[in-house]
């Protein structure tokens, strides 16, 4: 056997999974990603928007629109319409994000929050449609709440039973049930609306009790649910069982935990929270139902929960930021008279950077400067 020496080039960079990273460093990476995301948005906007190319000084107004999206200048706190719309959107997104979190901690990938919330809205509005004028308004609101919660729980518990008993793929199951929920709403609208428009107008029932502002109760409910769910997941026996099942089903079984029961019970909790969100939309906001009543927030909630590492309190900050982006991007489209797709592009770019930052939090990238090739002995 002869021995030859071959030149081996060092790789330009090396990836290694981090064993740990300090919280300040992780947040520094995230903040850097957000800053780069906003910078990239400015570059893309400059390229795509003719007004910015003609008047580069307008780039300052472009960034100012993010603040204008959540605050009306010269308005008091109570009368600040943009602020309360922002808080309303934040609260609904937070509620739906909370709904998917217990299942996610159990590694039950519930992608069906959109459909579970939509079915809850349908159940709530169905009660109002058939009982409006027949029962007192206070009783109608109570029955609407019960209908919303029960409807959402039923829609959530179906895939849970199939997973617990037959070990079906919950991701596909819950995803497909979103489409079934959409068609179910369209079916009832055809039955209820006789003129063929398939559009049900707002029903005339008493609004939810309000003080300080019409949306204040909705915001308060979202905050209360965040604290309650945090305590439930962190400091209760059921929360502990959810974590154990999420870590290892086999370990949970050896520990005497009834895994099937935990799966079904956890999805009942998720359905209940979707039902609360559905009730807030049906009784507190829209007073009607369409196939787009949830507006895709069930899917956005998945990202909120994941970015918050399934922590209900951190989720409030993530919901705040994503809603801030959405409102700001919408304000940009309105102020500069752009297509709504531009606002979605802007939001998507920033979220792409944020999601990408998680890679650098989990992995360390080491770059190697170009050096002379080193020799390596290889037996042949």
Task: Give the predicted meaning of each segment.
Residues 30-46, 94-100, 121-127, 148-152, ...:
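Hydrophobic core segments of alpha-helical transmembrane domains in multi-pass membrane transport
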Residues 268, 274, 280, 284-348:
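Transmembrane alpha-helical segments in multi-pass inner-membrane proteins
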Residues 170-172, 214-221, 263, 293-297, ...:
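Loop-to-transmembrane alpha-helix initiation sites
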Residues 4-95:
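Membrane-interfacial amphipathic/re-entrant helices at transmembrane-helix boundaries
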Residues 211-288, 312-313:
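Helix-loop-helix "hairpin" substructures at the membrane interface of multi-pass membrane proteins
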Residues 50, 70-131, 145, 149-168, ...:
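Single transmembrane alpha-helix segments in multi-pass membrane proteins
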Residues 170, 174-235, 288:
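Transmembrane helix-bundle core of multi-pass membrane transporters
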Residues 1-37, 227, 247, 254-261, ...:
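Cytosolic-side transmembrane-helix boundaries in multi-pass membrane proteins
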């Amino acid at each position: 056997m002869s021995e030859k020496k071959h030149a081996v080039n060092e790789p330009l960079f090396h990836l290694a999974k981090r064993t740990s990273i300090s919280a300040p460093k992780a947040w520094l990476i995230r903040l850097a990603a957000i800053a780069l995301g906003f910078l990239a948005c400015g570059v893309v906007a400059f390229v795509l928007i003719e007004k910015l190319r003609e008047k580069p000084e307008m780039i300052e107004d472009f960034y100012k629109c993010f603040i204008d999206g959540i605050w009306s200048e010269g308005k008091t706190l109570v009368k600040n319409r943009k602020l309360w719309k922002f808080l309303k959107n934040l609260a609904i997104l937070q509620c739906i994000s909370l709904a998917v979190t217990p299942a996610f901690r159990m590694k039950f990938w519930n992608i069906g929050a959109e459909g579970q919330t939509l079915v809850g809205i349908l159940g709530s509005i169905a009660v109002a449609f058939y009982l409006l004028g027949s029962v007192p308004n206070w009783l109608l609101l109570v029955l609407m709440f019960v209908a919303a919660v029960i409807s959402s729980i039923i829609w959530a518990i179906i895939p849970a039973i199939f997973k617990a008993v037959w070990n079906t793929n919950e991701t596909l199951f819950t995803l497909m049930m979103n489409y079934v929920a959409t068609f179910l709403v369209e079916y009832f609208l055809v039955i209820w609306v006789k003129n063929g428009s398939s559009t049900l107008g707002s029903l005339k029932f008493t609004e939810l009790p309000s003080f300080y502002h019409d949306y204040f109760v909705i915001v308060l409910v979202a905050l209360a649910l965040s604290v309650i769910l945090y305590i439930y997941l962190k400091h209760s026996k059921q929360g502990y069982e959810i974590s154990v099942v999420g870590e290892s089903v086999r370990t949970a079984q050896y520990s005497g935990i009834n895994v099937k029961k935990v799966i079904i019970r956890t999805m009942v909790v998720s359905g209940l929270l979707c039902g609360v969100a559905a009730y807030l939309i049906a009784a507190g906001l829209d007073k009607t139902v369409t196939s787009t009543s949830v507006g895709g927030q069930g899917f956005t909630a998945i990202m909120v929960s994941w970015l918050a590492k399934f922590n209900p309190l951190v989720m409030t900050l993530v919901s705040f930021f994503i809603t801030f982006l959405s409102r700001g991007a919408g304000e940009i489209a309105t102020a500069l008279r752009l297509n709504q797709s531009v606002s979605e592009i802007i939001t998507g770019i920033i979220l792409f950077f944020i999601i990408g930052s998680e890679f650098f939090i989990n992995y360390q990238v080491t770059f190697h400067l170009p050096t002379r090739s080193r020799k390596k002995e290889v037996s042949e």
